[in-house]
């Protein structure tokens, strides 16, 4: 759910494997990332922000929303993906009221390809650092 609307997220092979590993470790609860205080509530933005700070990222370096901004910028700049596909992946609502009323496309096939290529690129970046 995002903004009280269902949001389907295509997963890369890498993310599916990580989620399976998390499932194996953390049990079989309803939430993948539960709050440390309650198994019925998801982890909060503050919890994610605290994790970034523990990794020594300063306020001016990274925030939780920064991951979405970084993905949007890089995916748009590379020129391989249509703007509508990127916006759908980020669950951004169309600002044009008429288009928003009529276009309910989810672009799932294109988003699946985009997310797999994004994950592959991240793997390449990590490998090049080593």
PLM features: residue spans?
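Catalytic-site neighborhood detector that most strongly recognizes the C-terminal catalytic loop/helix
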Residues: 1-4, 16, 80, 90-125
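Residue-level detector of conserved, well-ordered beta-strand and adjacent loop positions
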Residues: 12, 34, 103
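Extended, non-catalytic subsegments within catalytic or DNA/protein-binding/adaptor domains
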Residues: 23-29, 49, 110-113, 122, ...
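Short, basic (Lys/Arg/His-rich) helix/loop patches that form interaction surfaces
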Residues: 9, 17-40, 46-88, 92
């Amino acid at each position: 759910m995002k903004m009280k609307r269902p949001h389907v997220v295509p997963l890369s092979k890498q993310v599916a494997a990580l989620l399976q590993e998390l499932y194996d470790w953390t049990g079989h609860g309803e939430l993948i990332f539960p709050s440390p205080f309650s198994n019925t509530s998801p982890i909060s933005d503050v919890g994610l922000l605290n994790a970034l700070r523990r990794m020594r990222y300063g306020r001016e370096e990274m925030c939780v929303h920064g991951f979405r901004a970084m993905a949007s910028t890089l995916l748009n700049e590379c020129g391989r993906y249509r703007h509508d596909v990127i916006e759908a992946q980020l669950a951004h609502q169309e600002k044009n009221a008429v288009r928003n009323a009529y276009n309910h496309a989810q672009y799932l096939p294109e988003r699946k390809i985009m997310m797999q290529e994004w994950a592959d690129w991240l793997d390449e970046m990590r490998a090049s650092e080593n």
